[in-house]
């Protein structure tokens, strides 16, 4: 089966919005062993849409078309498909009734323009969208089934999961069995990871892939076929052995997700005092439901005054060592932990840039501490100074990893290949 995708919308083509829909579709299908082989983005121009449908349908078996199903004048997908096939639009009575019922149930007055969403190409097969008003549909043109999906991400994901995947499974048969392991790493560059893992002789049917999303690089170990699937655990073990402490999570989308899972399951509590990370450590945990069960509080103590008055940092420490120092973050971590007697506390203080650095403490210098009921662990690292966001996100990742390792009762301070650490 040859799978392609046509993404529509002037705002996507011009870069006004990032096309996360296409990335999600490709990744979701890839994890099922279904590879996207071609993708094109087309603006809101009728001739271009018609040409894209006609041309790509000669090469693909199935095409996901995303966007352009709404009620406004720039939503052209249904009409463009009808023109591409040389047929009329006809009203789908079932969907018109769905629209009328949807607006009634939600106590809203339906603008007449919404009825446009019920007009589909004459040969179209309606695809249900129970979570929205844009009607999905599929049409056969030349060699391909074109499967039209809404641009709203929540609606798209629902339709792909509930409608598209079952359709292609039935239409094209079950794909070869596949399995996937994902390892999240920090402290390595992508090329460094590839060089390190080149030592492994991969069995037939197993492939390695890399996805950089700083501060993490995700390694995907993909196995296709029964024999490769049986060999997958051994290959995963080899990868982890070679990378050592660089692997910080398995089959989790982010390190924050790993920390949330471990804290939620453990019953331990956490408090956070942040300076250079500015609430990032706390915010990423709050994204997860249930974080209130372990997160006591997160404080952004950016100024020296707040470090002293809120956290109880001795002013002499700041005078002697400065805000970006191991003694300061240790005092911050101990102070915030003591407020509510939390099991763990994290603290950060650093120079995110672009200004503020010195010869002794250049931009990218960050001090991080973890306080427990048994002691304090701390380190000061030198991070890449490409942007404030990168310094903050990498600081957050290192802080999370210190906590993760403490929860696992492993060494809290470890060496990362590409992150130098200052001597204490």
From Swiss-Prot:
Coiled coil: none annotated. It comes from the Bacteria. SUPFAM superfamilies: CinA-like, Molybdenum cofactor biosynthesis proteins. CDD domains: cinA. This is CinA-like protein. NCBIfam families: cinA_nterm (TIGR00200), molyb_syn (TIGR00177), PncC_domain (TIGR00199). Belongs to the CinA family. It comes from Shewanella frigidimarina (strain NCIMB 400).
């Amino acid at each position: 089966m040859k799978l392609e995708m046509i993404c529509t919308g002037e705002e996507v083509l011009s870069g006004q919005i990032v096309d996360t829909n296409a990335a999600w579709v490709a990744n979701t299908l890839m994890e099922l062993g279904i590879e996207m082989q071609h993708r094109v983005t087309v603006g809101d121009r009728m001739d271009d849409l018609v040409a894209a449908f006609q041309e790509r349908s000669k090469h693909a078996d199935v095409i996901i078309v995303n966007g352009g199903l709404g009620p406004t004048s720039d939503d052209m997908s249904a009409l463009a498909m009808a023109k591409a096939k040389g047929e009329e639009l006809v009203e789908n009575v079932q969907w018109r009734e769905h629209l009328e019922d949807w607006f009634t149930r939600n106590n809203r007055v339906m603008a007449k323009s919404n009825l446009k969403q019920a007009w589909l190409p004459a040969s179209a097969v309606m695809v249900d969208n129970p979570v929205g008003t844009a009607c999905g549909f599929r049409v056969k043109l030349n060699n391909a089934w074109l499967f039209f999906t809404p641009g709203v991400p929540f609606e798209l994901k629902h339709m792909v999961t509930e409608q598209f995947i079952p359709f292609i499974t039935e239409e094209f048969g079950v794909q070869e069995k596949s399995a996937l392991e994902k390892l999240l790493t920090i402290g390595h560059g992508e090329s460094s990871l590839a060089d390190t893992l080149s030592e492994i002789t991969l069995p037939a049917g197993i492939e390695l892939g890399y996805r950089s999303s700083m501060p993490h690089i995700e390694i995907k170990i993909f196995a296709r076929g029964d024999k490769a699937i049986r060999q997958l655990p051994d290959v995963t073990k080899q990868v982890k052995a070679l990378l050592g402490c660089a692997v910080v999570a398995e089959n989790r989308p982010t390190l924050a997700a790993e920390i949330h899972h471990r804290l939620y399951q453990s019953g331990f509590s956490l408090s956070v005092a942040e300076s250079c990370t500015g609430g990032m450590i706390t915010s990423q945990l709050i994204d997860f439901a249930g974080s209130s069960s372990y997160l006591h509080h997160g404080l952004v103590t950016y100024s020296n005054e707040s470090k002293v008055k809120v956290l109880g940092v001795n002013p002499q420490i700041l005078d002697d060592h400065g805000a970006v120092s191991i003694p300061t973050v240790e005092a911050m971590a101990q102070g915030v932990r003591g407020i509510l007697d939390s099991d763990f506390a994290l603290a950060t203080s650093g120079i995110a840039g672009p200004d503020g650095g010195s010869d002794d403490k250049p931009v990218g210098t960050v001090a991080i501490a973890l306080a427990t009921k048994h002691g304090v662990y701390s380190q000061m690292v030198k991070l890449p100074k490409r942007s404030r966001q990168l310094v903050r996100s990498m600081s957050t990742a290192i802080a999370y990893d210190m906590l993760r390792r403490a929860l696992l009762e492993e060494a809290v301070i470890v060496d990362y290949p590409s992150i130098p650490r200052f001597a204490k």
